[in-house]
């Protein structure tokens, strides 16, 4: 007679069995392809309480359990001013998933609530600073965030449509303000739709953004559907009807940038123009190649 699995074990099995191809495989692909984890790393898995960061924490936990590469994990939750219900939901989900979280508090919601409309950028910047600081205090050399494939694609499109530049979201980067520390994105190759499917399969409920701004928006009927990211989500959804591979094409495009055809680009904070590079090469551009 087979032993009845605990809820957290059933959730783990769903990752490794039912959603192996859609979650575990792309997770491992990102870790290996972008060299995200090295022997001796001490990583702070940063958990906001949403579906993405909770899944990321579970994936890293499973990897640590089975990997030949030795590394340490800290499961870090920053409470930026959650209401009691959201704080409780995070703690309950962490217990359900058997994730031993370390929780610390900050006043981010208090500060950003006075900014005015859409304080999301400031909130994100402040969150990252607090997370880096606490992670370093706990002896970590890396923080892991739950950004996924869909975030990468949407950010790339948003940079062109609203930022007048071609800028992507890298799978890892070095911190400028916290020397010696890095940020990694282990879910870089995982699609959001697959995360949602896994969540529903297991009957899990996670918090959304949960900040005071979004709470007020929900109360007034403005649920954020006018946000630029939401606009891009809807656009990509529409494009998928005629081109199912559009998001994959955008994702692959940031891995295959042909600088010879770019009129201008920036690297290391230094701007380069097509004219400068053209003179340096000392050769004519062949029209039949473009």
Regions found by a protein language model. Give the residues of each.
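ATP-dependent adenylation/nucleotidyltransferase module used to activate substrates
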Residues: 2-158, 162-166, 170, 193-197, ...
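A structural signal for well-ordered alpha-helical scaffolds and beta->alpha junctions
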Residues: 20, 24, 87, 128, ...
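Long, contiguous hydrophobic alpha-helical segments, chiefly transmembrane helices and signal peptides
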Residues: 27, 31, 187, 232, ...
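Short, basic, helix/turn surface patches
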Residues: 126-138, 172-178, 233-253
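Catalytic subdomain that performs nucleotidyl-dependent activation
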Residues: 150-236
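The feature marks non-catalytic terminal segments
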Residues: 204-290
């Amino acid at each position: 007679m087979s032993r009845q699995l605990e809820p957290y074990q059933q959730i783990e099995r769903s990752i490794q069995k039912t959603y192996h191809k859609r979650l575990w495989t792309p997770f491992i692909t990102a870790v290996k392809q972008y060299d995200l984890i090295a022997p001796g790393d001490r990583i702070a898995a940063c958990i906001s309480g949403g579906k993405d960061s909770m899944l990321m924490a579970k994936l890293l936990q499973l990897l640590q359990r089975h990997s030949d590469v030795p590394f340490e994990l800290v499961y870090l939750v920053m409470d930026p001013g959650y209401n009691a219900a959201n704080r409780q939901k995070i703690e309950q989900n962490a217990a359900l998933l058997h994730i031993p979280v370390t929780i610390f508090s900050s006043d981010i919601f208090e500060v950003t609530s006075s900014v005015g409309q859409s304080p999301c950028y400031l909130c994100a910047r402040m969150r990252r600073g607090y997370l880096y600081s606490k992670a370093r205090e706990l002896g970590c050399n890396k923080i892991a965030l739950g950004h996924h494939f869909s975030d990468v694609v949407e950010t790339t499109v948003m940079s062109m449509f609203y930022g007048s530049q071609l800028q992507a979201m890298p799978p890892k980067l070095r911190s400028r303000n916290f020397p010696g520390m890095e940020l990694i994105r282990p879910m870089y190759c995982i699609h959001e739709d697959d995360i949602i499917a896994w969540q529903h399969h297991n009957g899990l409920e996670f918090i959304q953004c949960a900040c005071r701004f979004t709470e007020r928006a929900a109360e007034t009927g403005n649920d954020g559907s006018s946000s630029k990211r939401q606009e891009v989500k809807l656009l990509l959804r529409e494009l998928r009807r005629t081109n199912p591979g559009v998001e994959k094409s955008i994702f692959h495009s940031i891995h295959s940038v042909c600088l010879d055809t770019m009129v201008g680009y920036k690297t290391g904070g230094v701007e380069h123009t097509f004219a400068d590079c053209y003179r340096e090469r000392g050769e004519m551009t062949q029209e039949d190649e473009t």
